[in-house]
């Protein structure tokens, strides 16, 4: 019944298996990918007719993760998979980027590729398997897919490159890099790095490129054995048409490209396009050339003119040389009510960035195949139509916006303080207010400025730059800080972000084959010089984080308690924690490991809540002195309430240095007295003394008052001080971290 074809290879100690002919046989191309316990179904479907006049290749990639792949039922009311998650969008783009440039330029048939995770194994990189499966499915389809793509993931652990590291290994890796390409060249790179050098990044790309070559081989073998026919393609346009356009309109196009303003240049080129179409209108009526052929030939002429100016004259559209960076302007603090804000402008590209601090309750909950976790750093990239002067409605975030936001997130994330150092959640929103090349890198620069203005203790300022490439034969030019037109007509989009010390993110998309590691090395070094120049301009405005947080930011602290004390803070039915929140106005979040995060609108409310928590959860030590309230008088002594909710007993012999006949002759119910903890009886009850404590000069000696509230305030204040002293004297990382946090941000 099935005519199944299977190819396999042992890859990094695991068997990678590709098979076709059993599942989804009616699809033009269908491949099942297996590695470990991961199983993916990748299909490709090609429309029978071309979509004439569309102006671009209508390729759609959909990556889907099914809940049953890990034995789960989806949450929500409908209990089924809904719209694509952020991860699904990002992996879809990861598949699209190395594949899209490899189709015949005249191919405009609707093409859909779907990659579905049927079974998930956390020990295998399913995003890499999806790229491999999509490439194999297209190789089996009738689409004119000109070269075979494969991919690999690279980590860096203890100075050694690791192929396809597991999720657990990635937690300790200095690098998370995906590289895809053919047998000849790299086509795509996506990475997050922890301040690695250009040489290390280049070696990582080489390592990944060499590692996936056996996979390219088995995809080719699978396609050759399946022997599926391919669509025959004609030239995109007749060469005679291009020659005629070049002869008639080349001078006008050159003059248009000499205009520095994007809007004026675009208007001039649009007018030329109308003239070209009008000139050939008679041929359109005779059906000699169609509109799409004319527009395609015109774009080719424009590309040739732009590229020739760069390669032969070292002259770019706006008059810059290949290494020049556009003029930069930076401003911070322009939004008074925001926690932090910045405006970063580079030429005609501009990003307005704001940063907001929140609590752990504001963290993004992410639920995917790996399980549920929280993300404390969120970065939203917004690209409104007005940024390119287009009259279009605002819509939900596009795939492009999600992808650009994630790239900026990767660039910023490595330089953020950890949660112990800075217990806030952070949201950055970057509005692209103008765009003419590399708005994602403007987002990186603006985000760094806004975070520093907010007072977030980032490790170092970060800047980003987009590089381009023009290559003809062996001659090439690498372009720094590319414009939109240079991106469109060029051969590479190469984005690098990092500090003065190293790279934090690298993204590369190549449109042609033959880009070797020599060119990549030149591009990386040129990007480093450009990045340092941009950082220099940014540092003139703000070079390090503000010492204090914005007055609009919430106050927060973190307290580490014993896990057994969690129930005491919560109380029966949440009574205690609710009372603390209501009386202090603070928010409290308790983790299972005993980490208590407290958030409040101001420092006073924060102190009230945190002191109450410490009073409940932290046990007093023998020898410590507290202010307490007399709650009951007996013949043998008195009960004292201290440290919030704790009670102890003072024997009559411990009340005064002198002999007394009755307790009530010295103290009365409601009095505030100074007590020292001297031990515990056999039932665990605290034994206190007044006579020794009264001589202690380390505390203020308040006059007795009949105020329980004042007694609690004084008691809590004393307790807080003693904790801080102990934090410095004991080898206790949690308490030390807590004290440093309070001292840095709230004292």
Swiss-Prot record:
Molecular-function annotations in GO: 3'-5'-RNA exonuclease activity; magnesium ion binding; polyribonucleotide nucleotidyltransferase activity; RNA binding
Residue ranges, compositional bias (Polar residues): 699-712
CDD domains listed in its UniProt record: KH-I_PNPase (cd02393), RNase_PH_PNPase_2 (cd11364)
Main location (coarse class): cytoplasm
Any one GO biological process: RNA processing
Enzyme class: transferase
S1 motif domain sequence ranges: 623-691
GO CC annotations, alphabetized: cytosol
Subcellular location: Cytoplasm
Its EC number(s): 2.7.7.8
Positions with a binding annotation for Mg(2+): 487, 493
Catalytic activity: RNA(n+1) + phosphate = RNA(n) + a ribonucleoside 5'-diphosphate
Cofactor (UniProt): Mg(2+)
UniProt keyword annotations, A-Z: Cytoplasm, Magnesium, Metal-binding, Nucleotidyltransferase, RNA-binding, Transferase
Region (Disordered): 694-716
Start and end residues of each KH domain: 554-613
Domain of life: Bacteria
Described function: Involved in mRNA degradation. Catalyzes the phosphorolysis of single-stranded polyribonucleotides processively in the 3'- to 5'-direction.
Family as reported in the entry's similarity comment: Belongs to the polyribonucleotide nucleotidyltransferase family.
Name the record gives this protein: Polyribonucleotide nucleotidyltransferase
Gene name, Swiss-Prot/TrEMBL: pnp
């Amino acid at each position: 019944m099935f005519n199944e074809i299977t190819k396999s290879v042992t890859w990094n100690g695991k068997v990678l298996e590709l098979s076709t002919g059993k599942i989804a046989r009616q699809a033009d191309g269908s491949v099942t990918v297996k590695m470990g316990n991961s199983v993916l179904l990748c299909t490709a479907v090609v429309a029978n007719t071309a979509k004439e006049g569309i102006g671009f290749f209508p390729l759609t990639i959909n990556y889907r993760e099914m809940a049953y792949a890990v034995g789960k039922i989806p949450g929500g009311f409908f209990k089924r998979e809904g719209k694509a998650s952020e991860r699904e969008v990002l992996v879809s783009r990861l598949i699209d980027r190395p594949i899209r440039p490899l189709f015949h330029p005249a191919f405009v048939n609707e093409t859909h590729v779907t990659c579905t995770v049927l079974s998930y194994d956390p020990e295998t990189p399913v995003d890499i398997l999806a790229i491999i499966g999509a490439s194999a499915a297209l190789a089996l389809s009738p689409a004119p897919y000109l070269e075979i793509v494969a991919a690999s993931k690279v980590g860096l652990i203890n100075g050694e490159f690791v192929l396809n590291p597991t999720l657990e290994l990635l937690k300790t890796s200095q690098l998370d890099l995906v590289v895809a390409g053919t047998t000849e060249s790299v086509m795509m790179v996506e990475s997050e790095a922890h301040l690695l050098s250009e040489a290390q990044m280049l070696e990582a790309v080489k390592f990944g490129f060499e590692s996936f070559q056996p996979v390219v081989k088995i995809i080719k073998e699978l396609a050759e054995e399946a022997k599926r026919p391919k669509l025959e393609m004609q030239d995109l346009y007749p060469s005679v048409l291009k020659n005629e356009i070049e002869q008639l309109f080349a001078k006008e196009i050159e003059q248009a490209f000499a205009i520095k303003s994007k809007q004026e240049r675009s208007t001039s080129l649009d007018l030329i396009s109308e003239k070209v179409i009008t000139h050939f209108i008679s041929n359109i009526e005779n059906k000699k050339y169609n509109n799409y052929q004319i527009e395609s030939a015109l774009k080719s002429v424009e590309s040739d003119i732009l590229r020739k100016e760069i390669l032969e004259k070292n002259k770019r559209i706006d008059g810059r040389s290949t290494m020049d960076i556009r003029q930069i302007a930076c401003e911070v603090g322009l939004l008074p009510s925001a926690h932090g804000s910045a405006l970063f402008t580079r030429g005609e590209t501009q990003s307005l960035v704001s940063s907001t601090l929140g609590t752990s309750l504001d963290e993004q909950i992410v639920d995917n195949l790996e399980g549920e976790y929280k993300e404390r750093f969120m970065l939203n990239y917004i690209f409104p139509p007005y940024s390119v002067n287009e009259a279009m409605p605002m819509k939900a975030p596009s795939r492009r916006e999600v992808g650009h936001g994630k790239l900026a997130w990767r660039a910023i994330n490595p330089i953020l303080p950890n949660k112990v150092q800075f217990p806030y959640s952070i949201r950055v929103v970057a509005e692209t207010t103008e765009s003419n090349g590399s708005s994602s890198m403007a987002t990186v620069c603006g985000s760094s400025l806004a975070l520093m203005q907010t007072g977030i203790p980032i490790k170092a300022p970060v800047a980003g730059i987009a590089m381009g490439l023009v290559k003809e034969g062996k001659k090439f030019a690498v372009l720094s800080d590319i414009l939109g037109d240079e991106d469109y007509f060029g051969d590479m989009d190469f984005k690098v972000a990092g500090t003065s010390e190293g790279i934090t993110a690298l993204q590369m998309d190549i449109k042609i084959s033959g880009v070797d590691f020599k060119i990549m090395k030149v591009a990386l070094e040129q990007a480093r010089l450009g990045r340092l120049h941009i950082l220099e301009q940014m540092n003139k405005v703000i070079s390090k984080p503000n010492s204090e947080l914005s007055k609009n930011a919430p106050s927060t602290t973190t307290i580490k308690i014993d896990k057994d004390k969690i129930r005491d803070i919560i109380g029966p039915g949440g009574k205690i924690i609710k009372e603390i929140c209501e009386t202090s106005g603070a928010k409290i979040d308790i983790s299972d490991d005993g980490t208590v995060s407290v958030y409040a609108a101001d420092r006073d409310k924060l102190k009230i809540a945190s002191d109450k928590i410490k009073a409940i959860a932290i046990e007093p030590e023998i020898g410590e002195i507290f202010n307490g309230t007399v709650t009951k008088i007996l013949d043998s002594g008195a009960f004292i309430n201290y440290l919030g909710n704790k009670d102890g007993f003072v024997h009559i012999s411990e009340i005064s240095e002198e002999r007394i006949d009755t307790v009530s002759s010295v103290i009365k119910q409601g009095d505030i007295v100074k007590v020292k903890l001297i031990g515990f009886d056999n039932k665990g009850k605290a034994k206190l003394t007044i006579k020794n404590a009264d001589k202690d000069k380390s505390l203020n000696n308040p006059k007795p008052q009949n105020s329980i509230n004042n007694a609690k305030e004084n008691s809590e204040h004393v307790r807080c001080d003693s904790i801080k002293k102990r934090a410095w004297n004991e080898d206790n990382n949690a308490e030390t971290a807590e004290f440093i946090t309070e001292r840095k941000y709230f004292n």
